[in-house]
Curated annotation (Swiss-Prot):
Native species: Plasmopara viticola (Downy mildew of grapevine)
Domain notes: The structure of NLP effectors is remarkably conserved with a high level of conservation of a central region containing the conserved undecapeptide motif AIMYAWYFPKD and heptapeptide motif GHRHDWE.
Pfam families for this protein: NPP1
Keywords tagged on the record: Glycoprotein, Secreted, Signal, Virulence
Protein's job: Probable secreted effector that may act as a pathogen-associated molecular pattern (PAMP) recognized by the plant immune system.
Family to which the UniProt record says this protein belongs: Belongs to the Necrosis inducing protein (NPP1) family.
Main location: secreted
The protein's name in its UniProt record: NLP effector protein 8
Subcellular location: Secreted
Signal peptide segment: 1-17
Protein backbone atom coordinates (compact mmCIF):
# COMPACT_ATOMS: atom_id res chain seq x y z
CA UNK A 1 0.00 0.00 0.00
CA UNK A 2 2.87 2.39 0.73
CA UNK A 3 4.22 1.78 -2.77
CA UNK A 4 0.78 2.53 -4.17
CA UNK A 5 0.63 5.84 -2.33
CA UNK A 6 4.05 6.87 -3.62
CA UNK A 7 3.04 5.82 -7.13
CA UNK A 8 -0.05 8.02 -7.01
CA UNK A 9 1.91 10.94 -5.64
CA UNK A 10 4.43 10.60 -8.45
CA UNK A 11 1.73 10.56 -11.10
CA UNK A 12 -0.63 13.20 -9.76
CA UNK A 13 -0.46 15.22 -6.54
CA UNK A 14 -3.72 14.98 -4.63
CA UNK A 15 -3.16 16.96 -1.43
CA UNK A 16 -2.36 20.62 -0.92
CA UNK A 17 -1.93 22.51 2.34
CA UNK A 18 -3.82 25.67 3.18
CA UNK A 19 -0.72 27.78 3.81
CA UNK A 20 -0.75 30.20 0.88
CA UNK A 21 -0.86 34.02 1.05
CA UNK A 22 -4.29 35.52 1.68
CA UNK A 23 -6.00 38.08 -0.48
CA UNK A 24 -9.35 39.71 -1.11
CA UNK A 25 -11.99 37.62 -2.87
CA UNK A 26 -13.81 39.22 -5.78
CA UNK A 27 -17.26 38.17 -6.96
CA UNK A 28 -19.21 37.93 -10.20
CA UNK A 29 -22.92 37.29 -10.87
CA UNK A 30 -23.70 33.60 -10.62
CA UNK A 31 -24.42 33.21 -14.34
CA UNK A 32 -21.10 34.83 -15.39
CA UNK A 33 -18.61 32.49 -13.69
CA UNK A 34 -16.70 30.56 -16.35
CA UNK A 35 -15.98 26.92 -15.50
CA UNK A 36 -12.59 25.30 -15.77
CA UNK A 37 -12.11 22.95 -18.72
CA UNK A 38 -12.66 19.34 -17.77
CA UNK A 39 -9.53 17.55 -16.60
CA UNK A 40 -7.73 15.20 -18.94
CA UNK A 41 -6.83 11.62 -17.94
CA UNK A 42 -3.19 12.69 -17.78
CA UNK A 43 -2.38 11.07 -14.42
CA UNK A 44 -3.67 8.07 -12.53
CA UNK A 45 -5.78 10.03 -10.06
CA UNK A 46 -7.53 11.92 -12.86
CA UNK A 47 -8.12 8.69 -14.78
CA UNK A 48 -9.80 7.11 -11.77
CA UNK A 49 -11.78 10.27 -10.91
CA UNK A 50 -13.14 10.44 -14.47
CA UNK A 51 -13.88 6.72 -14.58
CA UNK A 52 -15.98 6.79 -11.40
CA UNK A 53 -17.50 10.27 -11.76
CA UNK A 54 -21.10 10.16 -10.47
CA UNK A 55 -24.14 11.21 -12.44
CA UNK A 56 -26.36 13.87 -10.87
CA UNK A 57 -30.12 13.83 -11.37
CA UNK A 58 -31.89 17.11 -10.54
CA UNK A 59 -35.45 16.53 -9.35
CA UNK A 60 -36.03 20.05 -7.99
CA UNK A 61 -34.23 23.29 -7.27
CA UNK A 62 -31.26 24.81 -9.05
CA UNK A 63 -28.89 22.98 -11.34
CA UNK A 64 -25.16 22.98 -10.50
CA UNK A 65 -23.19 26.06 -11.53
CA UNK A 66 -19.49 26.96 -11.50
CA UNK A 67 -18.49 28.39 -8.12
CA UNK A 68 -15.15 29.97 -9.00
CA UNK A 69 -13.18 30.91 -12.11
CA UNK A 70 -9.48 30.71 -12.91
CA UNK A 71 -8.88 34.24 -11.57
CA UNK A 72 -10.42 33.43 -8.19
CA UNK A 73 -13.71 35.24 -8.74
CA UNK A 74 -16.52 33.45 -6.92
CA UNK A 75 -20.25 33.38 -7.51
CA UNK A 76 -22.52 35.90 -5.80
CA UNK A 77 -25.23 33.27 -5.66
CA UNK A 78 -28.94 33.89 -6.13
CA UNK A 79 -31.14 35.36 -3.43
CA UNK A 80 -34.24 33.50 -2.28
CA UNK A 81 -36.34 36.61 -2.91
CA UNK A 82 -35.78 36.08 -6.66
CA UNK A 83 -38.39 33.34 -6.67
CA UNK A 84 -39.07 33.45 -10.39
CA UNK A 85 -35.44 33.80 -11.52
CA UNK A 86 -34.26 30.70 -13.35
CA UNK A 87 -31.28 28.70 -12.15
CA UNK A 88 -31.64 25.72 -14.46
CA UNK A 89 -28.09 25.81 -15.79
CA UNK A 90 -25.31 28.31 -16.42
CA UNK A 91 -24.89 29.68 -19.95
CA UNK A 92 -21.14 29.26 -19.36
CA UNK A 93 -21.40 25.53 -18.61
CA UNK A 94 -21.55 23.38 -15.49
CA UNK A 95 -18.85 22.13 -13.15
CA UNK A 96 -18.21 19.44 -10.56
CA UNK A 97 -15.21 19.72 -8.25
CA UNK A 98 -13.09 16.77 -7.16
CA UNK A 99 -10.40 16.12 -4.59
CA UNK A 100 -8.68 12.81 -3.80
CA UNK A 101 -6.68 11.43 -0.90
CA UNK A 102 -5.49 8.04 0.32
CA UNK A 103 -7.12 7.63 3.74
CA UNK A 104 -6.55 4.57 5.93
CA UNK A 105 -5.50 2.55 2.90
CA UNK A 106 -8.46 3.47 0.69
CA UNK A 107 -8.67 6.01 -2.10
CA UNK A 108 -11.30 8.61 -1.21
CA UNK A 109 -12.56 10.94 -3.94
CA UNK A 110 -14.87 13.80 -3.03
CA UNK A 111 -17.16 15.17 -5.74
CA UNK A 112 -18.73 18.52 -4.87
CA UNK A 113 -21.40 20.58 -6.61
CA UNK A 114 -22.21 24.26 -6.11
CA UNK A 115 -25.75 25.65 -6.37
CA UNK A 116 -26.46 29.40 -6.43
CA UNK A 117 -29.53 29.03 -4.21
CA UNK A 118 -31.27 26.56 -1.93
CA UNK A 119 -34.76 26.89 -0.54
CA UNK A 120 -37.70 24.90 0.72
CA UNK A 121 -41.41 25.56 0.39
CA UNK A 122 -43.42 25.95 3.56
CA UNK A 123 -46.06 28.63 4.06
CA UNK A 124 -43.31 31.04 2.93
CA UNK A 125 -40.09 30.75 0.96
CA UNK A 126 -37.22 29.85 3.28
CA UNK A 127 -33.65 29.34 2.17
CA UNK A 128 -30.40 31.05 1.33
CA UNK A 129 -28.08 31.94 -1.51
CA UNK A 130 -25.09 29.64 -2.13
CA UNK A 131 -25.20 25.93 -1.34
CA UNK A 132 -22.77 23.03 -1.66
CA UNK A 133 -23.48 19.31 -1.76
CA UNK A 134 -20.96 16.51 -1.95
CA UNK A 135 -20.40 12.78 -1.93
CA UNK A 136 -17.29 10.77 -1.10
CA UNK A 137 -16.49 7.66 -3.12
CA UNK A 138 -14.34 5.03 -1.42
CA UNK A 139 -12.26 2.76 -3.63
CA UNK A 140 -9.91 -0.15 -3.23
CA UNK A 141 -7.40 -1.55 -5.71
CA UNK A 142 -5.93 1.87 -6.32
CA UNK A 143 -3.75 1.47 -9.38
CA UNK A 144 -4.29 -1.67 -11.42
CA UNK A 145 -7.98 -2.40 -10.92
CA UNK A 146 -9.81 0.18 -8.78
CA UNK A 147 -13.07 -1.02 -7.28
CA UNK A 148 -15.89 1.12 -5.90
CA UNK A 149 -16.56 -0.17 -2.40
CA UNK A 150 -18.80 2.52 -0.91
CA UNK A 151 -20.46 5.86 -1.59
CA UNK A 152 -21.14 8.28 1.27
CA UNK A 153 -23.59 10.99 0.20
CA UNK A 154 -24.09 14.10 2.33
CA UNK A 155 -27.67 13.98 3.54
CA UNK A 156 -29.83 16.08 5.83
CA UNK A 157 -28.11 14.55 8.86
CA UNK A 158 -24.59 13.33 8.35
CA UNK A 159 -23.85 10.86 5.56
CA UNK A 160 -25.97 8.18 3.94
CA UNK A 161 -23.66 5.30 3.04
CA UNK A 162 -24.20 2.81 0.24
CA UNK A 163 -21.80 -0.08 0.80
CA UNK A 164 -21.54 -1.90 -1.45
CA UNK A 165 -23.37 0.21 -4.06
CA UNK A 166 -26.36 -1.69 -5.48
CA UNK A 167 -26.47 -2.32 -9.21
CA UNK A 168 -29.75 -0.41 -9.56
CA UNK A 169 -27.87 2.76 -8.57
CA UNK A 170 -25.02 2.17 -11.02
CA UNK A 171 -24.50 2.82 -14.72
CA UNK A 172 -21.25 1.11 -15.65
CA UNK A 173 -18.78 2.60 -13.12
CA UNK A 174 -20.89 5.69 -12.38
CA UNK A 175 -23.02 5.95 -9.25
CA UNK A 176 -26.33 7.77 -9.78
CA UNK A 177 -27.10 10.55 -7.30
CA UNK A 178 -30.20 12.70 -6.99
CA UNK A 179 -30.35 16.30 -5.78
CA UNK A 180 -33.61 16.09 -3.90
CA UNK A 181 -35.65 17.35 -0.98
CA UNK A 182 -38.58 16.51 1.21
CA UNK A 183 -41.40 19.01 1.55
CA UNK A 184 -40.02 20.81 4.59
CA UNK A 185 -36.29 20.27 4.06
CA UNK A 186 -33.38 21.81 2.27
CA UNK A 187 -31.86 19.87 -0.60
CA UNK A 188 -29.56 16.91 -0.08
CA UNK A 189 -28.06 14.01 -2.06
CA UNK A 190 -29.48 10.52 -2.25
CA UNK A 191 -29.06 7.47 -4.47
CA UNK A 192 -31.45 7.10 -7.39
CA UNK A 193 -32.30 4.68 -10.18
CA UNK A 194 -32.91 7.60 -12.53
CA UNK A 195 -30.14 8.59 -14.95
CA UNK A 196 -28.50 11.95 -14.41
CA UNK A 197 -26.02 14.25 -16.09
CA UNK A 198 -22.28 14.69 -15.98
CA UNK A 199 -20.62 18.05 -15.39
CA UNK A 200 -17.10 19.09 -16.38
CA UNK A 201 -14.84 17.67 -13.68
CA UNK A 202 -12.02 19.82 -12.33
CA UNK A 203 -9.72 18.33 -9.71
CA UNK A 204 -8.35 20.37 -6.80
CA UNK A 205 -4.76 20.25 -7.97
CA UNK A 206 -5.67 21.14 -11.55
CA UNK A 207 -7.22 24.42 -10.43
CA UNK A 208 -5.30 27.68 -10.28
CA UNK A 209 -3.94 28.75 -6.91
CA UNK A 210 -6.21 31.81 -6.97
CA UNK A 211 -9.25 29.57 -7.37
CA UNK A 212 -8.14 27.26 -4.57
CA UNK A 213 -7.48 30.22 -2.30
CA UNK A 214 -10.96 31.60 -2.91
CA UNK A 215 -12.51 28.24 -2.06
CA UNK A 216 -10.45 28.01 1.13
CA UNK A 217 -11.91 31.20 2.55
CA UNK A 218 -15.42 31.58 3.91
CA UNK A 219 -16.82 34.58 2.08
CA UNK A 220 -20.36 34.24 3.45
CA UNK A 221 -22.32 32.07 5.86
CA UNK A 222 -23.20 29.53 3.17
CA UNK A 223 -20.32 29.77 0.67
CA UNK A 224 -18.30 27.12 2.48
CA UNK A 225 -16.63 24.81 0.01
CA UNK A 226 -16.18 21.24 1.29
CA UNK A 227 -12.89 21.12 -0.66
CA UNK A 228 -10.82 23.28 1.70
CA UNK A 229 -8.40 21.34 3.90
CA UNK A 230 -10.29 21.53 7.18
CA UNK A 231 -13.70 20.66 5.74
CA UNK A 232 -12.29 18.07 3.32
CA UNK A 233 -10.47 16.04 5.96
CA UNK A 234 -13.38 16.39 8.37
CA UNK A 235 -15.62 14.95 5.64
CA UNK A 236 -13.26 12.00 5.17
CA UNK A 237 -13.33 11.24 8.89
CA UNK A 238 -17.11 11.46 9.12
CA UNK A 239 -17.85 9.57 5.91
CA UNK A 240 -15.34 6.75 6.44
CA UNK A 241 -17.47 3.61 5.97
CA UNK A 242 -15.19 0.74 7.04
Amino acid sequence: MHLTVFYLVALCTFASADDQPRYIINKLPYEQIKPFPAVEPDCRINEIALQFQPQLHISSGCHPYPAVDKNGYISTGLGVSHVFTDCDGSPEGSQVYGRAYVYKGYLAIMYAWYFPRDYMVSPVWIGHRNAWEHAVLWLGGLTEDPELLAVAAKSMWGYRTYAPPKSKYMKDDSFKLEYSWMVMSHHYLTATKDPGEFQDLIMWNNMTERARESLRLKSSSHFKSPLSDDRFFRALRKSYPF
